[in-house]
Amino acid sequence: MRKWFLIMATAVVLCSACGKKDASVNDVTQAAQASSTEAENLYKEGSQYVGEEDYESAIESLLKCIELDPDYSKAYIQLSKAYIGNEEYDEAMTILQQGYEKTKDTSLEKEQDNCVRTICQVLTDNEDYETAIPWLLKLQELDGVTVENSLQLAEAYSMMDDYENAVSVLQKADQNDASIKNALLEARVAYGQYCYD
């Protein structure tokens, strides 16, 4: 009888422990789901701020999102856009690199190339040629020498009165393209005038 009582007591203790384990697993699962929901809400909020061009608020929301869910790839992309909008170009690239290192999501690796292109376009549109030149050089590293990036880079050098580099860039581009020929002629004339003055 005593053995039977010990066996029953042991069974009750084991069943109680199993119930506690299931409860703790449920608590962890619920916490993860709540964290995921909160991260999704922060992502949506940050994306909305990007759309409204409130980049500082977007950066704040998206950083919190990534803190809650470091594997949330889309948040890294939106955060990069917010950094570009806030004219924090190096941070835009850095966050994509960190996101790729953390998640190994190839879309983040590809987005780094798009980020360079976007930064180049923003800087040339804003006529910030001094800042644009290093980014345009990175773009040529990514895409190779193309008519478009050669014209952009030559324009940036010309606007900085660096006609020698403008001519050099255009000489490396496709000489059969009419726009390159025209730009090269203009750059040579401007360089000659610059040297003469």
Please give the residue ranges for each predicted region.
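C-terminal motif of bacterial Sec signal peptides marking the signal peptidase cleavage site
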Residues: 14-17
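Short coil turns that delineate tetratricopeptide repeat
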Residues: 36, 70, 104, 144, ...
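Start-of-helix register in tetratricopeptide repeats
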Residues: 40, 74, 107-110, 114, ...
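Canonical tetratricopeptide repeat
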Residues: 44, 78, 111-118, 152, ...
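Register position in tetratricopeptide repeats
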Residues: 51-52, 85-86, 118, 122-126, ...
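Canonical positions in the second alpha-helix
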Residues: 64-65, 98-99, 138-139, 172-173
